[in-house]
Amino acid sequence: MAAAAGRSAWLAAWGGRLRRGLAAGRRAVPTRGPLAAAVAGVALAGAGAAWHHGRVKAAAREGSRTVSAQKNYLGPIEKLSLRKQRFMQFSSLEHDGEYYMTPRDFLFSVMFEQVERKTLVKKLAKKDIEDVLSGIQTARCGSTFFRDLGDKGVISYTEYLFLLTILTKPHSGFHVAFKMLDVDGNEMIERKEFVKLQKIISKQDGFKTVKTNETEYQDPTVKEPGVNTTLQVRFFGKRGEKKLHYKEFRRFMENLQTEVQEMEFLQFSKGLNFMRKEDFAEWLLFFTNTENKDIYWRNVREKLSVGESISLDEFKSFCHFTTHLEDFAIAMQMFSLAHRPVRLAEFKRAVKVATGQELSDNLLDTVFKIFDLDGDECLSHGEFLGVLKNRMHRGLWVSQQQSVQEYWKCVKKESIKGVKEAWRQQAGKGPF
């Protein structure tokens, strides 16, 4: 605990300020509450955009070889998908013409919409990448994995898409795809099968361009990186000789979701172990540009009482709910078809049906007060869903995306292709 607190204080002094309101120089005080395990995240969040801005001088002191951040890969920006643009903006490593993120870059990319910075991208030789990845196998594989690694990791674009999908989709679909590629039936896959799983999941997640909303041609054919990456070393070892069991992969998904949730909670709670309801509203509306945004903020000012707060556990339960938005939307269709408003009890029941869990009355009351556009104590659920999708996709959601049924149908189709290929490679001639 003392070591974590010391590291937090050092990072806070180095980072300077949090983009969304963390005061410069604020110290993180470790507590015995539920945020104790995540205390290092306060300082990492506090570093925020300021860290990226200071990266140039730090890199120069390290004597790293760098190239200008005027990345000519951006070219005609409108031809890149929203996710590709975000990846390019936050990536800080380059090897053999390919760009990569560090674990820190990834966390910042899901916390912040953009970074105002003039930065230099570090060019790495293959030996440099091996050095960067050297500590991954000994890192603690819990809910502080990415924070503990910091810059000691390499994340490819395919892995970036895969990690984003973990944050926005329920686990059930991953299990189906995992079992489809498990030709031995022991819920274990090898490295080459995991690469297929990444491409299958990432390929289907609606890679839309900014202006045309057409599927980007480059994304579905992203090639496998020519070097080891963070996830590959974490799951399969440096030489790729290990196998990955689904239970371990599920723990990784749960830990990743927990880590990002803790980081965002600390970001908007200003490092405290509770979040004011106004802070929760700010988190909800962070990536939202709806025309009713002013009405939502008026509701926050007029309907939410000063001093009321949201706990970390309540925040996590709400984030769990947001990974089941497609199922929740189906439950809401009965109200849309009947032209009926959604009242609190009906909303609560729909959440239970979609997720198997309940949201606290405190959370439900907060959501209803914010999204009651007409003052009739009913939820404007259509726009509420749009706001939540933008929130969970970190501003990268395109409304024309396919439904969850279409998504997993595509996943199943691609998984079958992967199974056929796996059988051919394993037996020379498969039963297909």
UniProtKB/Swiss-Prot annotation:
GO terms for molecular function: calcium channel regulator activity; calcium ion binding; calcium ion sensor activity; protein heterodimerization activity. Residues 169-204, 224-259, 290-325, 359-394 form the EF-hand domain. The keyword Phosphoprotein applies. Ca(2+) 1 binds at D182, D184, N186, M188, E190, E193. It is found in: Mitochondrion intermembrane space; Mitochondrion inner membrane. Keywords: Calcium, Disulfide bond, Membrane, Metal-binding, Mitochondrion, Mitochondrion inner membrane, Phosphoprotein, Repeat, Transit peptide. Changing D372A: Strong reduction of mitochondrial Ca(2+) peaks. The keyword Signal does not apply. One of its GO terms (biological process) is cellular response to calcium ion. Its main location: mitochondrion. The modification Phosphoserine is found at S202. Signal peptide: none annotated. Disruption phenotype: Mice display diastolic dysfunction, characterized by left atrial enlargement and delayed sarcomere relaxation and cytosolic calcium reuptake kinetics in cardiomyocytes. A significant proportion of mice die from abdominal aortic rupture. Residues 1-22 form a transit peptide. InterPro entries: EF-hand-dom_pair (IPR011992), EF_hand_dom (IPR002048), MICU1/2/3 (IPR039800). Predominantly expressed in stomach, intestine, skeletal muscle, kidney, heart, testis, prostate and uterus. GO terms for cellular component: calcium channel complex; mitochondrial inner membrane; mitochondrial intermembrane space; mitochondrion; uniplex complex. Ca(2+) 2 binds at D372, D374, D376, C378, E383. EF-hand domains 1 and 4 have high affinity for calcium and act as sensors of mitochondrial matrix calcium levels. EF-hand domains 2 and 3 are degenerate. Heterodimer; disulfide-linked; heterodimerizes with MICU1. Component of the uniplex complex, composed of MCU, EMRE/SMDT1, MICU1 and MICU2 in a 4:4:1:1 stoichiometry. Calcium sensor of the mitochondrial calcium uniporter (MCU) channel, which senses calcium level via its EF-hand domains. MICU1 and MICU2 form a disulfide-linked heterodimer that stimulates and inhibits MCU activity, depending on the concentration of calcium. At low calcium levels, MICU1 occludes the pore of the MCU channel, preventing mitochondrial calcium uptake. Belongs to the MICU1 family. MICU2 subfamily. This is Calcium uptake protein 2, mitochondrial. It comes from Mus musculus.
